[in-house]
Amino acid sequence: LFSTVTHSLKSIESEQLAHIQTLTANAAERTENIQRILANTGVKIPEKLAQADLDPDSAIGGPYEAPETTEMFENSISELDLALDQFEKVKSFARKLPFNNPAPGKQITSLFGNRVDPFFGRLAMHAGIDFRQKTGNDVRATGDGVVVTAGAMGGYGYMVEIDHGNGITTRYGHLSKILVDKGDTVSEGDIIALSGSTGRSTGPHLHYEVRRNGQAV
């Protein structure tokens, strides 16, 4: 009887350990996926987030064998905690970046890149994306950040610029009304302005830019 109970307990422990190891691997894979997406967009992940603060002995491998002590089980729990912690940190970092839509549901009328300039009729670089919006429609922040510009800015007309950190900023142009001030802290989804046709514009729309280290991307 004792032998049967011992065998059953070992079997349960083995199943639990295998499940924990699977969860750890899944968390690590999700973290790597987020890091890869950010790297492809040119966003540099802070070094403290890029690598988990793991013990050197955690970089090990080999075929699975059922543990004879609780040490392996406890180590696996610790590794899972570290993997989940890193995943949450990287996910939180990514969520602060401007990956959302400033004009949900609105038609895109002009893409980023070279196009025929609507005023000069010749090829010119368009540094953002234009969304069809009526004057007075809501314009939303695409990520958390701090307002660094809020006012008239030449061809942009009334414009808001938000600093999201890590060299990333967003610009919202041709606004009819600005609802934030320079220095304000905003969150993703906040209404920061109303669309319009101020500045160098042929009609009501939202001009939206993402810049990395000052360069439109």
Tell where the protein language model's regions lie, with residue ranges.
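Catalytic cores of peptidoglycan-degrading enzymes
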Residues: 87, 93-217
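Non-catalytic extracellular/periplasmic "stalk"
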Residues: 1-107, 111
